[in-house]
Every structure is written in structure tokens, then in C-alpha cells.
């Protein structure tokens, strides 16, 4: 599990595609301080398993489904990537629950500088938009962010200068593709309501109840 608080911006050293999957090597330092083979590191929000490492880089396999569902297949040498180690049991929970399992991608439609922040509008599919709500959590390239507002096909987030400095968002442009992970809580609630057995005793839990409770 991750929290969406980026620890380091690494750089792609090499990405080697082998048929339907790829092997990616990433230059990094901080996330390698206590790494072990088999550990997981989120790369632009994608949970990858470390298959080899040295003092300044690590390698991971990227499966075909991951290449299809995420933007990792578009990365090139020297592309900056957001990195976060899996959360330790005694770590601080600084963002929100992030699984590292990407739901899909979005496209940056607008970048609007403001006085003390920068507004990003992200356009994505209706399949993802159904889980994106005003003031809810969203993970963009592994970064835990709060949704400011939405419309039928896009949503906006406001990024403070510190986040732009400490992540790869400063390198993004209009048209850039980003990985999106919806808040896992909403997905579980939907499945709970849809798959409730017919013979189960009636519960007071409903969408209206959750809305009234502030969810």
C-alpha cells in the first residue's frame, strides 16, 4: 500500500520492450536506501516489483496489462518519474489509501497558473469519472491530490508550488498523459451495493445514507 506522497523523482535509464511486456531500469537514490529484492515501488503510481538493484538504480518488469492500462509504455530515457516506496507499518499516513493499481489514464487539458498555485484540468473517460467527486481524493501519476471540481468529462486539481517542485508535474504539458487511480473506498462501496445477496437482511446502508454522512 502507498499513500501518494512522492519521495523522489527518478529518471528512466532504460526501457526495453520484449514482446508484450517490458523491463524498465530507473535511476534513483532515496527509495533504494533500504530496498530488498521483491519490494514494491510505485512508479508514476504503478506498483512495480524490484527484480534487481544497485546503489543508484533498480529494475522492474512491466506486464502487458500494465502497459495497456497505464502510460508507462510511453516513457523514454531520461523521462522523470514519481517514486514512492510501499508504506511501512510504522510510517506516517500523509496522503490517502493508494493501491498502486491504475484504473486508467487521463489527458491534461488545461494548465492555468494562479497567484499561489497552478490549476490542472484532467480529461478522462466516463468509466473513471463516475468515481471522481468534488473534494474527493484522486491519484495522478502517484500523487495524492484533492479534486476541486468536476464536469461530465474532466476534473480539476490545484497544485501548490512545493508539489510541482517535488514531483514530475512541472515537466507535464497540455496533452500529456497521466496515470489515474480512483479512491478505492468508492469502488468497494459500489461493489458492496451491487453484489449484495438477495436473501441478506435489509441494511440501512445506501447511497443516500452515505451522502448524508458526508461521503
UniProtKB/Swiss-Prot annotation:
Positions bound to 2,4-dihydroxypteridine 2: 47-49, 61-66, 100-102, 135
Record EC number: 2.5.1.9
One Pfam family per UniProt: Lum_binding
Enzyme class, first EC level, given as a word: transferase
Molecular function GO labels: riboflavin synthase activity
Keywords recorded for this protein, A-Z: Repeat, Riboflavin biosynthesis, Transferase
GO biological process, one term: riboflavin biosynthetic process
Residues that, per the record, bind 2,4-dihydroxypteridine 1: 4-6, 144-146, 158-163
Swiss-Prot/TrEMBL Lumazine-binding repeat ranges: 1-96, 97-193
InterPro entries from the UniProt entry: ATP_synth_asu-like_sf, Lumazine-bd, Lumazine-bd_dom, Riboflavin_synthase-like_b-brl
Segments traversing the membrane: none
Pathway in which this enzyme or protein is active: Cofactor biosynthesis; riboflavin biosynthesis; riboflavin from 2-hydroxy-3-oxobutyl phosphate and 5-amino-6-(D-ribitylamino)uracil: step 2/2
Reactions catalysed according to its record: 2 6,7-dimethyl-8-(1-D-ribityl)lumazine + H(+) = 5-amino-6-(D-ribitylamino)uracil + riboflavin
The keyword Zinc belongs to this UniProt entry's keyword annotation: no
SUPFAM superfamilies on file: Riboflavin synthase domain-like
Keyword Phosphoprotein carried by entry: no
NCBIfam families named in the record: PRK09289.1 (NF006767), PRK13020.1 (NF009566), ribE (TIGR00187)
Subunit comment: Homotrimer.
Function text: Catalyzes the dismutation of two molecules of 6,7-dimethyl-8-ribityllumazine, resulting in the formation of riboflavin and 5-amino-6-(D-ribitylamino)uracil.
The protein, known as: Riboflavin synthase
Organism, scientific name: Actinobacillus pleuropneumoniae
Lineage: Bacteria, Pseudomonadati, Pseudomonadota, Gammaproteobacteria, Pasteurellales
Encoding gene, per UniProt annotation: ribE
Amino acid at each position: 500500500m502507498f499513500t501518494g506522497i512522492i519521495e523522489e523523482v527518478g529518471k528512466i535509464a532504460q526501457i526495453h520492450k520484449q514482446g508484450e511486456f517490458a523491463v524498465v531500469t530507473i535511476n534513483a537514490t532515496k527509495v533504494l536506501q533500504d530496498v530488498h529484492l521483491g519490494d514494491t515501488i510505485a512508479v508514476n503510481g504503478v506498483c512495480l516489483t524490484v527484480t534487481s538493484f544497485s546503489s543508484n538504480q533498480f529494475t522492474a518488469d512491466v506486464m502487458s496489462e500494465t502497459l495497456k492500462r497505464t502510460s508507462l509504455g510511453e516513457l523514454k530515457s531520461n523521462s522523470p518519474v514519481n517514486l514512492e516506496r510501499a508504506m511501512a507499518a510504522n510510517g506516517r499516513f500523509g496522503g490517502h489509501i493508494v493501491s498502486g493499481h491504475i484504473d486508467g489514464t487521463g489527458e491534461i487539458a488545461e494548465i492555468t497558473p494562479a497567484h499561489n498555485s497552478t490549476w490542472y484540468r484532467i480529461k478522462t473517460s466516463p468509466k473513471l469519472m463516475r468515481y471522481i467527486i468534488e473534494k474527493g481524493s484522486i491519484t495522478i501519476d502517484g500523487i495524492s491530490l484533492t479534486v476541486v471540481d468536476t464536469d461530465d468529462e474532466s476534473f480539476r486539481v490545484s497544485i501548490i508550488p512545493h508539489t510541482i517542485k517535488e514531483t514530475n508535474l512541472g515537466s507535464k504539458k497540455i496533452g500529456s498523459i497521466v496515470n489515474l487511480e480512483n479512491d478505492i473506498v468508492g469502488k468497494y462501496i459500489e461493489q458492496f451495493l451491487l453484489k449484495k445477496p438477495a436473501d441478506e437482511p435489509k441494511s440501512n446502508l445506501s447511497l443516500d445514507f452515505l451522502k448524508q454522512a458526508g461521503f
